[in-house]
C-alpha cells in the first residue's frame, strides 16, 4: 500500500469516527454502565437469578457499544503513528506491511460498527431463530435447504456467534426436510431478519442423470428469541402436543425414548418442535418459547401489514415472492430482489459472505422509513 493511499484511508476513517461520536453520548453511556455495575455489587443482587442475568446482559450490551467505539479510535490512532514511521523510513517493509494490514482491519471494523448503527428495531439485539423449509421439488429442494443451513452456519461462525441446532429432519436421499437453528450473539436477530422469505436456487442438478437445469425454492423464517419478560398469551386448550424420538443432524444420537416435542397452535396452524433438550419436559418448555416467539412475530407482521395498507406500500408474502435468487447456471449471480444488490460470486455467498446483502437490506429498510 502506498503511503498516500493510507493517508486518504485514515482520513476517511477519522470522518467516520467523528460521525459515530456525534451519535454516541459517551458521558451518559459511561454513567449508565457505572449504575449497572453498582447494582451488581449489592448484597441481594443474586437473590433473583433471572433478573440478575438480565442486568448483566444489558450491561454487557452497553459495554460492547462503548468498547467497540474506543477500539476504533485506538486503531486509527495507531495507524496515524504507523504513517509517521513510514514517512520517516519509506523503505521499511515491516512498517508498510503492518500499515496495510492495520488499514484493512480498521476498515472492516468500521464497516461492522456502521452496520450496527442501522439496527433500530426493538429486538435487533436478541438471539435469532431460523427455520429452513424446502419447497416441493424433491431431492434438489432438500439439498438446497442443506446448502442454506450450511451458509447460515458459516456466516454465524465467521462472526463468532454460537449455532445450536434445535430441530433437524434429514431428507430421504440428501439434504434436509426441515431444520431449526438458534444463532446466539449480540444483534444476531438484527442482522438475520434480512433473510426471512423465499430463496430461489438455479443450477444443473447433480441428482439429474440427464444434466438438466433445475429451479428450487426454500422458505426461511426468522424470529427473535424472546425471554419471559415478553408476555404472549397462549391458552393450553389451543395447543396440541406430539412427542417423537429426537436425533441430531444426519441421524446422530437418536434417542431410544420419545423426548422430542412438537407443538401445534390450532387457531393459527403454527407448528414448532424442539429436540435440543435431553428431556421431554425441557423440549416442551423450549418449544413453548419458540411458539410464543412465532405468535409475537405474527402479531408484528399483522401490524406491519395494516401500516403498509394505510401508506399504500406493497406487501409480498408466500411462495410467489422470492427475496433472493442464487443462479449457478447458465450464468453465476446472486441477486436480492428487494434491494437489487447483486454479486457474481455465488460460492462466496454460499460460504457465508452475507454481510453485503445484510447491509443493503438494512439501508433499504432505513430508506423506507425515511424516504427523504
Curated annotation (Swiss-Prot):
User: Gene Ontology terms, cellular component aspect?
Assistant: cytoplasm
Description of post-translational modifications: Methylated by PrmC. Methylation increases the termination efficiency of RF2.
Where does the protein principally reside? cytoplasm
Keyword Cytoplasm on this protein?
A: yes
Asked whether the UniProt record includes Transmembrane among its keywords, one would answer no
The subcellular localization recorded is: Cytoplasm
What functional role does this protein have? Peptide chain release factor 2 directs the termination of translation in response to the peptide chain termination codons UGA and UAA.
| Family recorded in the similarity comment | Belongs to the prokaryotic/mitochondrial release factor family.
Q: What is this protein called?
A: Peptide chain release factor 2
Q: Which gene encodes it?
A: prfB
